[in-house]
Regions:
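ATP-dependent helicase/translocase motor core
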Residues: 1-82, 86-104, 121-125
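Long, largely alpha-helical accessory region at the distal end of helicase-like NTP-driven motors
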Residues: 26-50, 288, 413-523
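Conserved helix-turn-beta segment of the N-terminal RecA-like "Helicase ATP-binding" lobe
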Residues: 114-137
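Conserved helicase ATPase core of P-loop NTP-dependent helicases/translocases
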Residues: 117, 135-141, 160, 309-312, ...
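Post-DEXD/H (motif II) to motif III coupling segment of the RecA-like Helicase ATP-binding lobe
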Residues: 179-241
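Conserved interdomain linker/interface between the two RecA-like ATPase lobes of SF2 helicase motors
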Residues: 220-299
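Conserved helicase/translocase motor-coupling segment
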Residues: 265-339
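Conserved segment of the helicase C-terminal RecA-like domain
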Residues: 376-381, 385-415
């Protein structure tokens, strides 16, 4: 039955094309390109790269935004692994075709050299031009700036606006656009006036509350979020286990950016028996939840270099061959580490500040979250490292270590981002066993871990400011009409959670969802 159901889902999927004998040569070329993609392989630049159906849907929506609404600044939200860069390259190719004979100058902006290099190779492949574009980042210096892949750091340090007029670039792509609310991007976004601005991101939501949507008429032109991507079999399913952590983070220093990383690192590495007990929990949980440790190809996300090194040594001492990498590791070290992991020589790479954005090891089948991740963007990027499809890979196993957290730590958004049904609150999902997980996915919380999360979420309703904030965003979050009954039902609240502070109408007025009013009896 399972085989028949799987076949039926593939047969009816729009992601597959009908095959006939006259397409044999095209299939052979495509399979070869998929297997042997190499930026130095000239044959790559002779292949026709066509969009998948979901990518074509996004391209069509972009065209509609521009032709019907006349919006030339557009944001595409696409889950890690769905080919955001390919979409931008295909869109640029269409732009060039529509403006044949014109320069069609391109500026592609990102904040990491790895992203820029991969993006340049992608554009060259889509355009079938091995000489297209140049890098301006690190040690790379371009001969021409007409088609430029530029880091935001170089843009600012080189005073790039002095070299170019506001309308010099016809088409500008800003990758990982969630960074664009930062001060470093403001000069670029305010100075240039391109014919087309395209923003790309997997998660437009920022933990500091600053929105990037005003750059795009407060609209998302097209999106394919993580649950939809899994449902459409563009990413592999996951089994997520929330493991009860042995350490209490409730007393650690908290600032605007989250936990103090130094205190976290010391707790995880220098606290003697506490650190060893936690590391032992990680190993025992791994052995409990994975089917075969010898088949594991894993990444462990750590808070510091010391933490990554500590976990690496602990795993090796337990007979689980591992290495660690940091943001300072060279390209050669990273490539060698990837090869050793894929070949099975090692089981884990413990990392700090890498494998978040723009780096892929599709074979990864296990991810360990060994530190609290305050940023939803980073959480989804790190999760996405393991969601790539790969041969003989059935699913991704995720172990997230959950302890008592600061009341300001946001568990809710993290779990909401994993669920297909946005009309049910996270509290209800926890109580019902995460029935809205994407197809083929499974979320399980250990008993104490579930209690820590529920207590944390409920605490966020424990003051008037928290209630006002949730009322203000209720319709957007839930898709429901804002009524007292809907609010209580969605958040699984007792009415006393509201009325111990104020009336529901007064909270709505403070949230600007209704007009202010005067009620003498309130006194």
């Amino acid at each position: 039955d399972k085989i028949a159901a799987t076949f039926e889902s593939y047969w009816n999927s729009s992601e597959f094309e009908y095959y006939s004998e006259d397409q044999k040569e095209r299939l052979a070329r495509a399979l070869k390109a998929e297997k042997y993609f190499d930026s130095n392989n000239a044959e790559v630049y002779t292949m026709d790269i066509t969009p998948y159906s979901y990518q074509q849907e996004i391209l069509d929506k972009l065209e509609a935004e521009r032709t019907i609404r006349r919006y030339t600044r557009n944001l595409v939200v696409a889950a890690t692994g769905t080919g955001k860069t390919v979409i931008s390259a295909l869109d640029y190719k269409r732009f060039c075709k529509q403006n044949s004979g014109k320069p069609c100058r391109l500026l592609f902006v990102a904040h990491r050299e790895e992203i820029l290099r991969q993006s340049l190779y992608t554009f060259r492949a889509v355009l079938k031009d091995a000489n297209f574009g140049e890098l301006f980042v690190g040690n790379y210096r371009p001969e021409s700036i007409d088609h430029l892949f530029l880091s935001i750091q170089t843009f600012n340090s080189q005073d790039f606006t002095a070299k170019t007029a506001p309308d010099f670039y016809d088409y500008i792509v800003v990758d990982e656009f969630h960074h664009a609310a930062a001060p470093t991007y403001q000069k670029l976004l305010s100075y240039y006036q391109p014919k087309i601005l395209l923003g790309l991101t997997a998660t437009p939501e920022r933990m500091d509350g600053k929105s990037v949507l005003p750059y795009f008429n407060n609209r998302i032109a097209a999106e394919i979020r993580l649950p939809e991507a899994i449902d459409r079999k563009l990413l592999c399913p996951f089994q997520y286990f929330g493991v009860t952590d042995t350490v209490d983070l409730n007393t650690l220093k908290w600032s605007a950016g989250g936990y103090d990383k130094g205190e976290l690192s010391n707790l995880y590495t220098l606290s003697g028996a506490v650190a060893n007990r936690r590391a032992d929990l990680v190993v025992s949980s791994l052995l409990k939840y994975v089917t075969d440790i010898d088949e594991v190809k894993g990444l462990g996300f750590c808070v510091s270099i010391e933490h990554a090194e500590f976990m690496c040594h602990y795993f090796n001492d337990c007979g689980i061959p591992s290495i660690f990498l940091t943001g300072k590791s060279s390209d050669e070290e990273r490539k060698a580490a990837k090869g050793r992991l894929v070949s099975g020589e090692i089981r884990f790479i413990f990392v700090v500040d890498i494998y978040n954005e723009g780096v892929d090891i599709p074979e990864v089948n296990t991810v360990l979250f060994l530190r609290p991740t305050e940023s939803l963007t980073i959480f989804l990027q790190q999760l996405g490292r393991g969601l790539r499809l790969a041969e003989d890979k059935e699913c991704l196993t995720v172990l997230d270590f959950i302890g008592q957290a600061n009341k300001k730590y946001n568990f809710e958004d993290k779990f909401a981002a994993l669920l297909s049904n946005t009309t049910r609150s996270v509290i209800r999902e926890i109580k019902d066993g995460f029935v809205s997980a994407p197809k083929g996915c499974y979320i399980q919380l250990e008993k104490k871990a579930a209690k820590y999360i529920l207590d944390n979420i409920r605490a966020s309703y424990g003051n008037t400011a928290g209630l006002v904030s949730r009322v203000a965003s209720f319709t957007e979050d839930s898709g429901l009409e804002l009524t007292l009954a809907n609010f209580l039902d969605y958040y699984h609240l007792d009415p006393r959670a509201i009325y111990k502070f104020s009336s529901f109408s007064r909270i709505c007025a403070r949230a600007d969802t209704i007009a202010d009013f005067s009620e003498p009896l309130e006194e």
